[in-house]
Design a protein with these regions (language model features):
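Conserved GNAT acetyl-CoA-binding A-motif
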Residues: 91-101
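K/E-rich alpha-helical interaction surfaces of small helical-bundle regulatory domains
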Residues: 26, 107-110, 114-126
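Conserved glycine-rich acetyl-CoA-binding loop
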Residues: 67, 71-85, 103-111, 115-116
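Acetyl-CoA-dependent GNAT
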Residues: 4-73, 81-90, 141-144
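Short acidic/glycine-enriched loop/turn segments that link adjacent beta-strands
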Residues: 37, 61, 106, 128-134
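Conserved catalytic-core motifs of GNAT/GCN5-like acyltransferases
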Residues: 99-101, 119-136
Length: 144
């Protein structure tokens, strides 16, 4: 079930974060995101186990996905698409688009985003470190 993330899940989310990203956010950063009233922080939880999460924001017109990850044990089960859909549904009626950046080498994520309607909009050179890599900017129009 996907719902608003809760503080009791932060340690599990941090473990997924560490496994998914070389520049993982700390538990403190995740807690700050949870407390951000302008943010959207959702988690997919089954029987008390966090299987994935998505963190983003919206300025009223543009949604932005900062982080999305699914635990390795639960990938390829549609959880990523469910999280993207839940994020889009959490946006206000005024939202017109969603954007995100993804490592150029992350083909599985690029494929997921493309299957959800995101299109490549540009490249941010050397956006990532550890290892140094370009970021692909992807945007999806929101139709409500």
């Amino acid at each position: 079930m996907i719902a608003l993330a809760e503080e009791c899940f932060i340690s599990q989310i941090a473990e997924i974060e560490k496994a998914a990203f070389s520049d993982a956010w700390s538990e403190k950063s995740l807690e700050s995101a949870l407390l951000d009233e302008t943010g959207i922080f959702l988690a997919e939880v089954d029987g008390g186990e966090v299987r994935g999460y998505i963190i983003g924001s919206c300025d009223g017109f543009s949604g932005y996905i900062e982080r999305i990850a699914v635990s390795a044990a639960h990938r390829k089960n549609g959880i990523g698409k469910q999280l993207l859909s839940a994020f889009e549904n959490a946006l206000p009626e005024t939202a017109e688009s969603i954007s995100l950046e993804v490592r150029a080498s992350n083909s599985p994520a690029i494929g997921l985003y493309g299957s959800f309607g995101f299109e490549r909009a540009g490249v941010r050179r050397n956006m990532y470190s550890s290892p140094k890599e370009d970021g692909i900017v992807m945007i999806k129009k929101v139709i409500k």
